[in-house]
């Protein structure tokens, strides 16, 4: 059975499934660079619009049209046979991609080319995550999705899209566990190709719990950590993320892992 995957946009992103609302999560800062675009394209302007980087066109767009060229990766390696979609409109709460859409599929090098689309502003550029209903935004360094400015007779060179799995196994605390406030051990299974990990423990303030910000995105080189400060009584949600040596996120633990401090 193929492992379920989720999507990634750099720094913070929205995870979406077709026909459903999105939920915001944190992720890694990618250090990878595409062979046919520069990192300049990954940063939006003050209007939230990403402009094309420079690169070598695979082919020229038809007169008056635009092409979109980019790459999809997993673990800093090409991800072939991935469906990519350019969306005229995007609503993260009402089904995602809307309006005119244009599609392509990545080749053996993880590269794609969406050909001959009308120029203008598009609200999403997504890559389907293998055989799951999830997809990723081609964005970097900011919150959420972005808009993309496609110019007539030009190829838009998009930021890399980096995929990650959601199969990192959290060993303790176990989901639904009730634990004492002192000496809580966070432990997880080693993940293939992971160079380091980050864990976050978020409080449900309605339960009386309080977030200790020392335990948000805390980097750990091993696979366990004993909290050096007690947690207040209440309910908490824990996530663990794995990163490779290029600071690219590989995987996260399931997002429904909660425990209670007695």
State each model region's role:
Residues 1-8:
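Bacterial N-terminal signal peptides that target proteins for export
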Residues 18-21:
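C-terminal motif of bacterial Sec signal peptides marking the signal peptidase cleavage site
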Residues 9-13:
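Hydrophobic helical h-region of N-terminal Sec-dependent signal peptides
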């Amino acid at each position: 059975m193929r492992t379920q995957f989720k999507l990634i946009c750099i720094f913070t992103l929205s995870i979406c499934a077709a026909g459903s609302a999105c939920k915001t999560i944190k992720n890694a800062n990618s250090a990878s660079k595409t062979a046919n675009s520069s990192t300049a394209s990954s940063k939006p302007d003050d209007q939230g619009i990403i402009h094309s980087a420079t690169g070598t066109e695979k082919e020229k767009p038809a007169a008056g049209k635009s092409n979109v060229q980019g790459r999809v990766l997993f673990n800093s390696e090409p991800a072939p046979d991935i469906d990519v979609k350019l969306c005229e409109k995007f609503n993260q709460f009402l089904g995602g991609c809307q309006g005119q859409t244009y599609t392509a599929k990545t080749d053996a090098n993880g590269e794609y080319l969406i050909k001959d689309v009308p120029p203008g502003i598009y609200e999403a550029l997504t890559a389907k995550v293998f055989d799951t209903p999830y997809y990723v935004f081609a964005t970097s360094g900011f919150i959420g999705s972005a808009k993309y400015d496609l110019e007539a007779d030009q190829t838009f060179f998009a930021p890399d899209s980096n995929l990650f799995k959601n199969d990192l196994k959290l060993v303790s605390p176990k989901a639904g566990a009730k634990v004492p406030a002192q000496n809580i051990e966070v432990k997880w299974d080693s993940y293939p190709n992971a160079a380091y990990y980050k864990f976050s423990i978020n409080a449900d303030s309605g339960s009386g719990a309080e977030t200790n910000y020392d335990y948000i995105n805390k980097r750990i080189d091993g696979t366990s950590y004993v909290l050096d400060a007690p947690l207040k009584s209440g309910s908490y949600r824990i996530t663990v993320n794995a990163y490779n040596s290029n600071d690219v996120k590989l995987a996260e633990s399931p997002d429904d892992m909660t425990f209670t401090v007695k």
